[in-house]
Structure formats: C-alpha cells, structure tokens
From Swiss-Prot:
Family, per entry: Belongs to the Casparian strip membrane proteins (CASP) family.
Residues passing through the membrane, by range: 30-50, 73-93, 119-139, 165-185
NCBIfam families: A_tha_TIGR01569 (TIGR01569)
Organism, scientific name: Populus trichocarpa
Ranges per topology, Extracellular: 51-72, 140-164
Name of the protein described by the UniProt record: CASP-like protein 2B2
Length: 202
C-alpha cells in the first residue's frame, strides 16, 4: 500500500521507495544548492556594503570619518557574513559534486557534520544581525537618557549603506535558517529509513 509515494509496512511505519528517495534527494539538493548560492552572494554583498562604507564629515572645522570599525557590532556582522559566504561556497561545491555524481547522501557522520555546520551558521548570522540592528537603532534614534546623539543625522550616506548591508545580512540569516531545516530533514530521514527497514523485517 502506498500514499503520496510513501510505502507503508504492515507495522504502519512509512518506508520511502528507492526511486522516490532519489527523486526527493535530487529536489532537496537542488533547493539546498540554490539557497547556498543565495547565501554566498548575499553574504559577500553584505560584507562589502558594510566593510567599504565610509563618510567624512566636517564638524567644527575638524574632519571626522565614520567607518564600520567604529561599531563592534558592524565588525561582527562583516566577519559573520564573510564566514557564512565562504562556508556556503564550500558546501555548494559539495552539492554540485554530489548532483553530478548522482549519489544519494546515506552517510550519517557526514549528514551530522552538515547539520551541525548549518546550525552554527544560522545562529552566527542571526546573532550578528540582531547585534547590528540594535546598534543601528541607537545610531538612528539616539538615546536621550544617555545623551547619545542621532548619528545618522550627520552621517546619512553611511547609515543608508549600513542599512542596505543589514538588509542583505537579514536575508542571509533567514536563508540559513531555512537551510538548517533542510539539512535536518536530510539527516533525520536517514534514521527514518532505518526504522522503516526494521519495521519491514517484523
């Protein structure tokens, strides 16, 4: 008996057919490859936008230059997105090689490594975006209680470019969360397949 391409054993344990498993794996890998390419491109874009952002302003005959290194949260954002882009590039190459060879991922240790790496990257990018958004809000709105000025009133171009970089980084973090869900599916379906085989034996 089958339902939606999934076989059901006498013990009512779903068992994926071999051919359907390959089709599912191909679609999952294609989605994974697209997301990794998006993360790589947007990660580089976010790092470049924030890392190259500068603006010089003359205040009381003194020139002051705003750069991303003035805010530690922006430095963290640049580093985190650079790491995420490099990681996604490596994993993207792995996806391409796997798709060319037509192999199906059955290695549990490798699946665990990919799952753990994606989880770490998701947490890293999310924390970087959260820290950058908080710092950017202080720069935009100021903090009257602490007598912090609205920096963006003086460095408008700098703040606008930082905002674009944070928006790109936000898309990276969201894509990374989706990708971690895909890698968790790829991992735990291996255990589901084993359970199905055990159920079929009974």
């Amino acid at each position: 008996m089958s339902y939606l391409g999934v076989g059901v054993s006498p013990g009512n344990v779903p068992v994926y057919h071999g051919m359907n498993l390959k089709v599912i794996d191909r679609r999952v890998r294609l989605a994974e490859l697209v997301l990794r390419c998006v993360i790589c491109a947007l990660g580089v874009l976010a790092a470049v936008l924030v890392g190259t952002d500068t603006q010089v302003k003359e205040i009381f005959s003194i020139q002051k230059k705003a750069r991303f290194t003035d805010m530690k949260a922006l430095v963290f954002l640049v580093v985190a997105n650079g790491i995420a882009a490099a990681y996604s590039l490596v994993q993207g190459v792995r996806c391409v090689v796997g798709m060319v060879k037509g192999s199906v991922l059955f290695s549990k240790p490798l699946a665990w490594v990919i799952f753990s790496g994606d989880q770490m990257m998701a947490y890293l990018t999310l924390s970087a975006v959260a820290a950058a958004v908080q710092s950017a809000s202080f720069a935009k709105l100021g903090q009257p209680d602490l007598q912090w000025m609205k920096i963006c009133n003086m460095y408008g171009k700098f703040c606008n470019q930082v905002g674009e970089g944070i928006a790109s980084a936000l898309l990276v973090s969201v894509s990374m969360v989706v990708l971690s869900c895909i890698s968790s599916f790829s991992l735990f379906r291996l255990y589901g397949g084993n359970k199905g085989k055990d159920g079929a034996r009974w």
